[in-house]
Amino acid sequence: MIKTLNIKAQHIRLSLICCALFFSLLGWGQIVWGPNALPIIDMHSGETTEDLSIEISNSYYKGFDESNTLTPNLRLNIPLFTRWVNLEAWYSVMDFYRHEMQDTRHETNWHNVAGDIYVSTNIQVLHHNWITTQKKETQNIASLQYIPSAVFRIGIKTASGGDFENQRFIDAPGYFLDFTLAEKFHWQNKWAKSLSIASSIGFYCWQTGCAEQNDAYMYGIRAEFEAQYLRLLTEWGGYTGWQNNGDCPMSIKTRLGMPCPLGFEPYVAYQYGIHDWQYHEFRIGLKYSIDIIK
């Protein structure tokens, strides 16, 4: 009996060692995975909204290693009975991908796999409109003039993504939280409407391998210019893990939208991986918004 238990214990130890060796060789940083496995999460603008918005888009990722990925995306934002708390969800519906290295070995190189779902709650903890109201009441303009808007966001990542064997998605849950400060400057003219500057810092955590988890801090800077029929934003950011296995991705993103009547906004976007995110992303999409808090 004791001998049998010892043999089973040895088998368990051997299995754990093999598991740890496999995952250490596999790597758990974004650099070795598909573009949507552990993506750099878009910064929040610093202001929640009273609009229900639905966004559909399609992304093409060109890897620095000549890999190709096509991904349709969905995004949804819902005010929770007030504009100060929003529920947001986004989903990489399906990755269609191929690697150029496989071209000589396979007749059909394209594969597809479902992606992960992200859900977050965004809470407005400070807003410049509140400050404007307080200015009128107190007339203490000097001390209140430069107080920014602020949003606290907490979210989760599901483990719904597949094709772990080909390193498309990590097949593990995660969560994140961040805090964004934003200042908005308005102009009184027919063409230029506003300029918003935001910065954020946060925490990102995901499960890796047999037992460990990777903890990373998130960071970002964002600028958004809005005109009558144009919206241009640029964002630099990323996150930094502690395992030094390609887990410190950084990128710069830019997006050009054209707000139209009836709440529609077509847009084009581009993302370039600066470090540990080895892709160019080209995106085209359409956003629809409607005010449901009146």
Kindly give the residue locations of the regions a language model identified:
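Short loop/hinge segments at the start of secondary-structure elements
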Residues: 257
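Hydrophilic extracytoplasmic domains
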Residues: 261-294
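A mid-sequence, solvent-exposed acidic-amphipathic segment
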Residues: 194-237
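Transmembrane beta-barrel domains of Gram-negative outer membranes and organellar outer membranes
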Residues: 30-159, 165, 172-188, 222-243, ...
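Cleavable N-terminal export/targeting peptides
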Residues: 1-41, 293-294
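Hydrophobic, aromatic-enriched interface-forming segments
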Residues: 168-211
